[in-house]
Amino acid sequence: MSRIYCGGGGISTAVQASDKADSTTNRRYVGKLDSIQKINEVIIVGTPVIPKYREVIPAQVLKEVDLQRLNSLSVADAIRYFAGVQLKDYGGVGGLKTVNIRSMGTNHMAVFYDGIQLGNAQNGQVDLGRFSLDDVEEISLYNGQKSDIFQSAKDFGASGTIYITTRRPRFEEGKRANFKATMKTGSFGLINPSMRYEYKISDAVSSSFSGEWINATGRYKFRYRRRNTLGEIAYDTTAYRQNGDINATRMEAGLHGKMADGQWTVRAYTYNSERGIPGAIVNNVFRHGERLWDTNSFIQGTLTNRWSKKFRTLFNTKYAADYTHYENQDAKLIQTKNTY
């Protein structure tokens, strides 16, 4: 019994000693806090909250840094990294590439280039393969509409929307010009040189020009084998894909300006291509006579200005011209030669 009592007394003494130490420490800190203290300067740096992250429908976004890491040539190649997207490739290296979201068809998909809708009044399709990533700063995908007050009727009526934001010139201190040239090669005879030039006209106005050339033969080896109902090989053919070539040029020019409470942009675009349409792989058919020529050009302008915290204006204007020439010179089919 005495041993248990002594142990309890020891614990009690230790607690009293600890209370004394805490009391002394508190008095010391109270004395310091009762006087004026000097705090070192703290600088907090952060990025503004991007409006799309406050959207009702979240957006999938590919930034410029992400696009540079991707092994992609065009906007169509980059969009396949988004979830829930069905990329339709109509064959060949230069084949038409469109996007389908929510299984509602390509015609219900809206594509916007710097906030202005892209379209083709002839066929209603937007070929995303003709837009290079060299001039793109950001690609956003919405499974619906974005939560922005400035939207056209096409925004609200589309099942999905893609927003392509082009790159605005940025200059280091003391520099007035930027130049970049690239050369890409790949399979099937692909050659893709491109260049971009930016010039600072003044502190508020800058210009940009870019161009590229794409050429590919589209020839690749394939094997076509078929068995009959008994499981025996009916025929086994190895051949080269024909009529899958492309020869295309793209040029863009932009004029960018900044104001006290806004900014404006004028952009001109032209795309010219000649391509073959390889068609389906059919037994003993190795040559297709379908050819397609496209010329797509537009000039557009955007002006935004914030007059106050509650009042903001946006003006968009655009003129576009599209030309399509289609030929089918296959000897076994009805020959066609149409121009739109």
Enumerate the language-model features and the residues they cover.
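Outer-membrane beta-barrel pore domains and translocons
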Residues: 47, 144, 165, 182-188, ...
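A beta-strand signature from Gram-negative outer-membrane beta-barrel systems
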Residues: 133-180
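Flexible loop and strand-edge segments within Gram-negative outer membrane beta-barrel domains
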Residues: 220, 242-248, 261-313, 319-339
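Transmembrane beta-barrel wall of Gram-negative outer-membrane proteins
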Residues: 187-215, 227-274, 295-307
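Hydrophobic, lipid-facing positions within transmembrane beta-strands of outer-membrane proteins
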Residues: 40, 97, 158-160, 177-179, ...
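Extracytoplasmic beta-strand/coil segments of soluble accessory domains associated
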Residues: 76-120
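Transmembrane beta-strands of outer-membrane beta-barrel proteins
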Residues: 177-181, 207-209, 264-266, 312-317
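Short, acidic, small-residue-rich periplasmic hinge/interaction motif at the N-terminus
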Residues: 11-68, 76, 106
